Amino acid sequence: MKIAVIGATGKAGSNIVKEALDRGHEVTAIVRDSAKVTESRATVVQKDVFDLKTDDLKGFDVVVNAFAAPLGQEHLHVDAGNVLIEGLRNISGTRLIVVGGAGSLFTDESQTLLVKDAPGFPDFVYPTANNQGKNLEILRGTSDLNWTFISPSAEFALGKRTGSYQVGKDTLLVNSKGASYVSYEDYAVAVVHEIEKPQHLNQRFTVVSES
């Protein structure tokens, strides 16, 4: 498949690029600075996400939004999401995969409290979580786009690629140790698996792995 990854040099994006290439897909890394791309197997396009138009996104089976907004500019998660919605809604057959956050998940099955609103949630993370949540709500209100929003666990860290993970929908998951954890490597496995075998069209899902 032909896959474009926006934000391909970040932790999530770079692992998704590698996983997709390792599985034999054609990957285009769309980045602001081509010098930061270390994966020689990927095609590189140097372009800011806010400059992307429909013509830039044509020809891809899937566009992965792994954009990471700088601290203090977290509203750009919403802005970048809107750019991609507008760019893709006129392209038939191209799917949008969004690298989301855990803050918009519910804390438990009662589904009365979001992670980002729970006591003890870090203040400096809240703007990112809040704006990623807004992006999700906008997607849920979009009827002419094929999308999937993938939330990691509360702890999202570089680790090992085990290839094993558990899937949930809108509630924060924990592993056998009681930890809400997923490595970037296993998250990338889940993303590419969803690309290859779609199970969550126009939905959000979340993943957890062993720590």
Predicted stretch roles:
Residues 34-91, 199:
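NAD(P)H-binding glycine-rich loop region in Rossmannoid oxidoreductase-like domains
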Residues 3-23:
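N-terminal Rossmann NAD(P)H-binding glycine-rich loop of SDR-like oxidoreductase domains
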Residues 2, 6-9, 93-96, 170, ...:
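Mid/C-terminal beta-alpha module of Rossmann-like enzyme folds, strongest
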Residues 34, 83-127, 137, 141:
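Conserved Rossmann-fold NAD(P)-dependent oxidoreductase catalytic core, especially the SDR/UDP-sugar
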Residues 4, 28, 148:
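Conserved beta-strand positions in the Rossmann-like core of class I SAM-dependent methyltransferases
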Residues 137-157:
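Conserved beta-loop-beta element that borders a ligand/cofactor-binding pocket
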